[in-house]
């Protein structure tokens, strides 16, 4: 019987396939974090799901927290793409804020697994949870900074709205938190209660946005 190649025996991909292996690891980690919870999931369980040895995982991630942060930043990165489209196509400051909320809601409902992982429960490592959206954004490549980058874009939109002459009831960061809390509540409820007989999802999203905007404007 021919001997297994070193790459197969070690669980390594051939040269040039490392990115594929990294994505396989992240997919396995995401599935297990959702199925068993972040705290209960072990490196060995992730390695078994991928079909490699535990040491092979350390070629890509130094620990479980690094995997979770990569999943968070991957998710936020996709959301940021939608926000960037808004910034490039919507000129009215108030409409930008509305579009932000709409894009956020649609993203969450289109990607319920990712949303549950990142926003619902206690999956986020404590090192990031402590600072949350107030993490410094001077280095956009810092692991776990994705959420803060998304929040900063909303703060910027609200600052632009204020600069256009619209008066806000509260400081911009407080208004941003209120907007996020409102739309997050709608999205989280719909994701966690998919069987609930919601009246009309589109109206609920629009209605919450109307309530939020009336609340933050003077």
Give short role names for the model-derived ranges.
Residues 71-99, 129-132, 137-139, 154:
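Amphipathic alpha-helical linker/stalk segments
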Residues 115-116, 130-131, 136-144, 151, ...:
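Hydrophobic/aromatic-rich alpha-helical bundle segments in the mid-to-C-terminal region
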């Amino acid at each position: 019987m021919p001997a297994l190649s070193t790459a197969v025996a070690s669980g390594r991909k051939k040269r040039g396939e490392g990115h594929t292996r990294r994505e396989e690891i992240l997919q396995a980690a995401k599935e297990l974090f959702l199925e068993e919870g972040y705290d209960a999931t072990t490196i060995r369980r992730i390695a078994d799901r991928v079909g490699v040895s535990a040491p092979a995982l350390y070629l890509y991630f130094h620990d479980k927290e690094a995997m979770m942060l990569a999943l968070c930043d991957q998710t936020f990165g996709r959301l940021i793409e939608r926000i960037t489209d808004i910034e490039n196509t919507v000129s009215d400051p108030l409409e930008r804020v509305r579009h932000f909320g709409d894009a956020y809601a649609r993203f969450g409902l289109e990607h319920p697994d990712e949303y549950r992982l990142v926003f619902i429960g206690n999956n986020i490592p404590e090192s990031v949870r402590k600072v949350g959206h107030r993490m410094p954004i001077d280095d956009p490549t810092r692991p776990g900074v994705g959420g803060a980058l998304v929040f900063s874009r909303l703060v910027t939109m609200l600052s632009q709205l204020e600069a256009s002459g619209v008066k806000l009831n509260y400081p911009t960061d407080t208004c941003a938190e209120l907007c996020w809390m409102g739309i997050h509540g709608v999205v989280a409820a719909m994701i966690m209660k998919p069987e609930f007989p919601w009246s009309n999802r589109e109206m609920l999203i629009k209605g919450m946005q109307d309530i939020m905007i009336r609340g933050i404007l003077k």
